[in-house]
Amino acid sequence: MGAFLAVLAEVFDLASITGLSVESILSGEALTTAELLQSHINNLVVYGGLTEAEALAAVEVTPQAFAALTSLFPNFPQALGALAATEFTATGALTVGAAVSAALYPYYWDYRTPVADLNMALQIWYPDLDILFPGALPFARFVNYIDPANWAADLYRAVGRYFWERVQAAGINFIEQQMETGRELAMRSVTSLSETLSQYFENARWAVSGLSTSLYHGLESYYSQLGLSPIQQRQLARNLGHPQPYRYDLYDAPQLKGQVSATYVTKVDPPGGANQRSAPDWMLPLLLGLYGDLTPSWKDTLEELEAEEDGSHSQKAKRRKTKA
């Protein structure tokens, strides 16, 4: 076994010196490489007029690697295989012989052969201390952890490490709890805000108004019912030959008729008499959106708006690229 390991060690040394792999050396490819390299060096020396050192420098091969390659003999793989086979055969024969001899060894129940020769103890057995003295092993382990010569520093280090581990674990747990509490608080805040807004919109008094139409009608009514100014009234009375009106009476303008600016939506009580929450159909998309649910029509509308925005952004990006 030692000879085989020595040969393997030499193979690894050759691989490290020559730069070839162990597989190429064991398979015999390194022999071909060595022969080709040696013939090339000889050609450079004979026909090129170079020395051996210059030829090795020209092919970038160190003298140590060249010497290691030339030291390989042609039947090296076969010799290594024969050595391995011989080693395996010898080891197998010894193992089989030892097993057979151990199986055929005469053993009698009357203990003619001493028990000490058959069962040799590698070390003296001692009973566990915890059986006789409970708590002795933890105390001994604690004493081994603390150096008697530097017991104060070791104790301070052990207590500090334990305190730091506990503080670190408590800090991690506290941070996780705070993050979970913040998440729950944010969800509660969003839920309460949505609930408040939805109830506000449900209980609000809604009115339908056409702002542009009512504005023009209001202006028309105002100018059509607007009276004459005091100067115009005195001029008109003077032209008609009527007595001029008293100046304080000029400001008694007729009251304009009230204009209706909007129409209130009639609020219907919940059907069934259970006083459950109810809302008109036109308000459902708003309330469902506050609670996070979207109707199919409103979802399609949002998708169309997002597609338009994405298209406008892509067109702007293309314009920037073309300008650049």
Swiss-Prot record:
Region (Disordered): 302-324
GO molecular function, a single term: structural molecule activity
Alphabetic keyword roster: Capsid protein, DNA-binding, Host endoplasmic reticulum, Host membrane, Host nucleus, Late protein, Lipoprotein, Membrane, Myristate, Viral penetration into host nucleus, Virion, Virus entry into host cell
GO cellular component, as recorded: host cell; host cell endoplasmic reticulum membrane; host cell nucleus; membrane; viral capsid
Taxonomic superkingdom: Viruses
Keyword Membrane (UniProt): yes
Leader sequence segment: none
Any one GO biological process: symbiont entry into host cell
Region (D1) residue spans: 261-296
N-myristoyl glycine lipid sites: 2
Region (DNA-binding) location: 301-324
UniProt keyword DNA-binding present: yes
Compositional bias per record (Basic residues), positions renumbered to this chain: 315-324
Motif extent (Nuclear localization signal): 311-321
Record-stated family: Belongs to the polyomaviruses capsid protein VP2 family.
Protein name: Minor capsid protein VP2
Organism of this sequence: Murine polyomavirus (strain Kilham)
